């Protein structure tokens, strides 16, 4: 395709130049107005920013004063809470002591009633035992005298409710050699608290007397046990 085939365009350069000049003038005015607006906006922004900063300073100062008053109030409130806590603790401690004293009083009262009942029961039991002993002694006095005179039985009070029974006339080489045991009579059931020399089956004998309540038979069994132990010791020496 050749240039001859394109249409011919006639340009009015003077008119185009005038239009471009007008456009440039309009655009320059637009730029100046926009610069002026930007400058005004900037100045307004700086003014508002200054006002905001001033207001912020005033607000911060007011906040500091408020915080100071709040701190003073908080310290005062904490002090009151501490004093209240101390008072409540003192009241609680006093109440605990009072409750403990009341419980202790109740416990002591219950223990007192319990021991009164035990003492009353023991007195009644002791009276029954003394009556039974009195009746038994009326039958056994001759036998007891025989035990004391011929079998070498002696009785000694060790301390309250504990009696020592001493046997002699067991060792043929030394008739004065003592074989003894101590028995506690405080409770209804007897209890051997010391035995010399020790008998291996003493617990069985104690259980027997507690079951039968035959104390004289118990003395016979204990003396028999000492004799058997002595004979066993002699046989081991031979």
UniProtKB/Swiss-Prot annotation:
Coiled-coil intervals: 28-141
InterPro entries given in the database record: Spc25 (IPR045143), Spc25_C (IPR013255)
Any GO BP: attachment of spindle microtubules to kinetochore
Pfam family, one: Spindle_Spc25
Annotated compartments: Nucleus; Chromosome, Centromere, Kinetochore
Keyword check for Nucleotidyltransferase: no
Protein origin, superkingdom: Eukaryota
GO terms under cellular component: condensed chromosome, centromeric region; kinetochore; Ndc80 complex; nucleus; outer kinetochore
Record PANTHER family: KINETOCHORE PROTEIN SPC25, KINETOCHORE PROTEIN SPC25-RELATED
Family: Belongs to the SPC25 family.
Cited function: Acts as a component of the NMS (Ndc80-MIND-Spc7) super complex which has a role in kinetochore function during late meiotic prophase and throughout the mitotic cell cycle. Acts as a component of the essential kinetochore-associated NDC80 complex, which is required for chromosome segregation and spindle checkpoint activity.
Protein name per Swiss-Prot or TrEMBL: Kinetochore protein spc25
Originating species: Schizosaccharomyces pombe (strain 972 / ATCC 24843) (Fission yeast)
Encoding gene (name): spc25
């Amino acid at each position: 395709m050749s240039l001859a085939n394109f249409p011919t365009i006639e340009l009015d350069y003077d008119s185009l130049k005038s239009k471009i000049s007008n456009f440039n003038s309009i655009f320059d005015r637009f730029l100046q107005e926009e610069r002026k607006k930007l400058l005004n906006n900037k100045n307004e922004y700086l003014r508002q920013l200054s006002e905001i900063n001033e207001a912020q300073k005033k607000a911060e100062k007011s906040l500091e004063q408020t915080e100071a008053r709040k701190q003073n109030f908080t310290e005062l409130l904490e002090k009151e809470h501490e004093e209240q806590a101390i008072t409540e603790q003192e009241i609680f401690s006093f109440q605990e002591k009072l409750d403990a004293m009341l419980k202790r009083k109740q416990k002591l009262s219950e223990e007192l009633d319990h021991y009164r009942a035990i003492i009353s029961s023991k007195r009644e039991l002791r009276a029954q035992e003394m009556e039974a002993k009195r009746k038994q002694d009326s039958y056994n006095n001759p036998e007891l005298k025989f035990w004391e005179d011929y079998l070498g039985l002696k009785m000694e009070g060790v301390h309250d409710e504990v009696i020592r029974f001493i046997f002699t006339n067991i060792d043929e080489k030394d008739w004065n050699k003592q074989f003894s045991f101590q028995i506690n009579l405080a409770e209804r059931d007897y209890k051997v608290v010391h035995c010399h020399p020790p008998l291996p089956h003493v617990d069985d004998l104690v259980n027997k007397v507690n079951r039968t309540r035959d104390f004289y038979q118990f003395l016979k069994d204990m003396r028999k046990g000492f004799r058997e132990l002595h004979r066993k010791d002699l046989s081991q020496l031979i």
